[in-house]
Regions:
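Peripheral terminal and inter-domain segments
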Residues: 328-429
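Bacterial N-terminal signal peptides
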Residues: 1-8
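Active-site-proximal alpha-helical segments within enzyme catalytic domains
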Residues: 172-176, 216-237, 281-298, 311
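Catalytic-site signature segments of enzymes, centered on catalytic residues
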Residues: 134-218
Length: 429
């Protein structure tokens, strides 16, 4: 295979709506913001996609290392869960739902023939706190299209006792919200939060059952993540309007079991709370500093490393609210913010092995991407990789030599792909 750097992105134009300020105007030294950015960019096995730092509701620093840009949407993985937690609170406020409601009562037609006492006792709160009593089955969604029925058919231990992190529990919450509101989770959030907050750059993956996946699958811009983080920081208030009940935000951000609230995590830094997604997606909410930090990335190291950089490089410099004098450090920050870029993939630009595979169909083993075969077309400045999916869909991915190339993939949510690659080798029969 031709190996290159491949970033999954989705572009949508909606940026720079939050007010901007200098770090010094909000009581933060530019030097500390630069130190955070430099430290994050230097992490091994990590590609930073974006970092946005806010204080007092204003953006005081942001980076989008090339080829990333503010208008790109990012795949949020489990950061999606916190939005589901908010939707549950909204449904409760609308008198459509109770924490004590039994999960099985929403899906009587999907219950097993024999309903155990533990299944009958499982509540909405148990799903919120990851204490459903069902052992997580991370492969279930790849083996069946009947997710709700399969989940309810599994053995259930005593609910409410043991924390077992499970994205399907959050999917069940999405299904419940859809059941009681008559609209998908995404449409409900659009009505209640996204439209008032002018978050229009959002999409959410859909299950075979026609339900937003809930526990994963949200695609959203970094600035919109920052807006949502501010909403939580301000206890549900947005531009003077109470969009999300303050009491519910408090419950979401309060320890319910272990280090978990309602679809959110408590942090190592005292009082800080976070949204947390695979491969290093974070929204850090830091009440004592009146700050929000958004990080999107692809990292293969322990995510606690990134959080420690925020705690140790940035926060110690935030000692008060008095404005500081902006000088050379701010000018340096301005220059660096626009200069960050992801590293170039190393390797050769060509190989004698290319001819063996060029313009030929390469059949693939079954894989999670649903790719059936590839064709590699080597051009002067790029490689065109034609992908054929098992359903017959075809599209091209472009890999540039010493430059980024963009291609789009049709579907929902839509993707843009930017890639830069060099020849590292071909492996095959």
């Amino acid at each position: 295979m031709f190996l290159g750097l491949l970033g999954a992105l989705a572009a949508h134009a909606q940026i720079n709506e939050l007010p901007r300020s200098t770090p010094e105007a909000e009581g933060v030294p530019s030097k500390a913001v630069t130190a955070l950015f430099d430290s994050l960019m230097a992490l091994p096995k990590t590609d930073i996609h974006s970092v946005v730092v806010l204080r007092h509701g204003k953006v005081i620093g942001e980076i989008y290392p090339a080829p990333f840009a503010p208008e790109y949407r990012h795949t949020m993985y489990s950061c999606s869960k916190t939005f589901v937690g908010a939707a549950v609170g909204l449904a409760i406020a609308d008198n459509r739902l109770l924490l004590t409601d039994r999960v099985g009562t929403f899906f009587p037609e999907l219950l097993p023939d024999s309903v155990s006492a533990n299944l009958a006792d499982m509540t909405v709160r148990d799903l919120l706190t990851m204490t459903s009593g069902i052992t997580p089955d991370w492969n279930m969604r790849n083996l069946t299209s009947d997710w709700i029925r399969t989940f309810l058919a599994k053995p259930v231990k005593t609910p409410g006792k043991k924390f077992e992190y499970d994205s399907i529990s959050t999917y069940m919450l999405s299904a419940i919200v859809q059941k009681v509101t008559g609209m998908t989770l995404l449409d409900y959030l659009k009505q209640k939060l996204f439209t008032p907050m002018h978050i229009t750059d959002v999409a959410w993956e859909i299950s075979p059952e026609g339900i937003n996946t809930g526990g994963w699958g949200l695609h959203i811009q970094s600035e919109s993540l920052a807006k949502f983080g501010l909403l939580l920081l301000n206890r549900g208030v947005w531009e003077g309007r109470q969009l999300l009940p303050a009491s519910w935000v408090e419950q979401m951000m309060t320890r319910q079991i272990g280090d978990y609230g309602y679809q959110m995590w408590l942090c190592e830094y005292p009082g800080a709370i976070r949204m947390d997604g695979a491969l290093g997606q974070y929204v850090l909410i830091i009440p004592d500093k009146d700050m929000v930090v958004v990080i999107t990335e692809c990292t293969l190291i322990d995510g606690a490393t990134q959080r420690r950089l925020v705690w140790n490089r940035l926060l110690p410099a935030v000692t008060g609210d008095q404005p500081l004098i902006a000088g050379k450090d701010y000018k340096r920050l301005q220059k660096k913010q626009s200069s960050y870029q992801l590293p170039v993939v190393q390797g050769k630009a060509s190989s004698s092995l290319v001819g063996k595979y060029a313009d030929k169909s390469i059949m693939l083993e079954p894989n999670k991407f649903g790719w059936q075969s590839l064709e590699l077309h080597f051009k002067q400045k790029e490689v065109i990789m034609t992908v054929t999916e098992t359903n017959g869909t075809k599209y091209d991915l472009l890999f540039g030599y010493k430059q980024w190339k963009k291609a789009s993939i049709e579907g929902y949510p839509p993707y843009s792909i930017e890639a830069k690659g060099r020849f590292n080798g071909i492996e095959g029969p």
